[in-house]
Amino acid sequence: MALVKKPVTGMKDIQPAEMQIRDYVIGLIKETYKGFGFTPIETPCVENIANLSNKQGGENEKLIFKILKRGEKLNLETAQTEADLVDSGLRYDLTVPLSRYYSNNAANLPKPFKALQIGPVWRADRPQKGRFRQFYQCDIDILGDPTNLAEIELILATTTLLGKVGFKGFTVHINDRRILKGMAKYSGFDEAQYDEVFIILDKMDKIGLDGVAKELASNGFAEESIERYMGLFKGLNESRGWCCLSCRDTW
């Protein structure tokens, strides 16, 4: 059989010049984050399918590269559902592996624990320009510190790194699940619905507020709750615009 020279669709070869740049940037990342006390860790590329499908990954869970069971565990004749065929998959981000890692090793780690991860992740997405099925992610996390100081340190470390890399005039977007929960509760959603609501809300950049409202409605959520929820976000956008103008005029 002739050798297929091109990489699998959605994958790419890294040429020496690009690899040199990547190594330089990763070196800066490690140097900067280590300076803030973050410790590099490594987790397996393959995780238990139950962990990857825990409904915390949003749309990414639909993009898992799943791995068939092997040997005696794989029985095509008796398999009735996908769960009978699959027991593991490639990680789609670094958050799920970190949760498992910390749960398994917390007793032997300092508190708080400041973790740094850099590594490839995989998503069975539709390949398009600038969008690949394998790409690198970098995560920093502080576990065991519930104070806002931990959040501030994450922002400070990241903005320091971006400055070293050469970025200027960038904007840091901050998300706090506690705020989202408070808004959802005020709008009348049940707590059991939060995860589903947030998964849809995560699409806002792609489909806009109107698209989010339509998808919430198509999933059977109460119209009154949707209207109140969307009203909060419209108010936030107006306030954000006013704050940006005010800061620009002041500073």
Q: What are the functions of these language-model segments?
A:
Residues 1-14, 18, 55-56, 69-83, ...:
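Metal-assisted phosphate- and nucleotidyl-transfer catalytic regions
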Residues 18-38, 47-48, 80-87, 93-109, ...:
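Positively charged, Gly/Ser-enriched RNA/tRNA-binding surfaces
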Residues 30-31, 42-43, 57:
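Generic N-terminal leader/targeting and pre-domain segments
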Residues 38-52, 70-72:
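Short active-site-proximal "capping" loops at secondary-structure junctions
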Residues 42, 53, 117, 171-173:
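Structured core elements
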Residues 45, 120, 174-178:
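A general secondary-structure junction signal
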Residues 50-64:
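Glycine-rich loop at the start of a catalytic domain that most often binds anionic cofactors/ligands
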